[in-house]
């Protein structure tokens, strides 16, 4: 099975980018508008400047997060339940939760970000 591609202004093969490149910055997030994984919101905006469409965090039909180390794709619930990859045990940046609204929406929020 082919591994999903991660887009962005990447600085390594583990999904770190020009904007977020600390030791724990090893995830990428799927954007609904592109149906692709981007290292961060800024990378998405700079590379594909269109209205951002977000997935609902409760959508279990499509993986929304990918581990940049082992490339495991996971649901938002699987990702947010732990601060590490369930497959390779790589640690995730706990500060990412401060930006969930840039990537995901809740049931009562609009899909698009302007």
From Swiss-Prot:
InterPro entries: Mito_Tim_assembly_helper (IPR052604), UCP017292 (IPR016694), Znf_CHY (IPR008913), Znf_CHY_sf (IPR037274)
Origin: domain of life: Eukaryota
Cellular component terms (Gene Ontology): mitochondrial intermembrane space; mitochondrial membrane
Zinc finger intervals, CHY-type: 10-90
One GO process term, biological-process aspect: protein import into mitochondrial intermembrane space
Entry's localization field: Mitochondrion intermembrane space; Mitochondrion membrane
GO molecular function: zinc ion binding
One Pfam family from the record: zf-CHY
Residues reported in the UniProt entry to bind Zn(2+) 1: 17, 19, 40, 43
Keyword tags: Membrane, Metal-binding, Mitochondrion, Protein transport, Translocation, Transport, Zinc, Zinc-finger
Membrane topology of this protein: Peripheral membrane protein
Main location group: mitochondrion
Residues bound to Zn(2+) 2: 67, 70, 85, 88
PANTHER family noted in UniProt: HELPER OF TIM PROTEIN 13, ZINC FINGER PROTEIN
Role according to the record: Required for the assembly or recycling of the small Tim proteins in the mitochondrial intermembrane, thereby participating in the import and insertion of multi-pass transmembrane proteins into the mitochondrial inner membrane.
Subunit text: Interacts with the small Tim proteins.
Identification of the protein by name: Helper of Tim protein 13
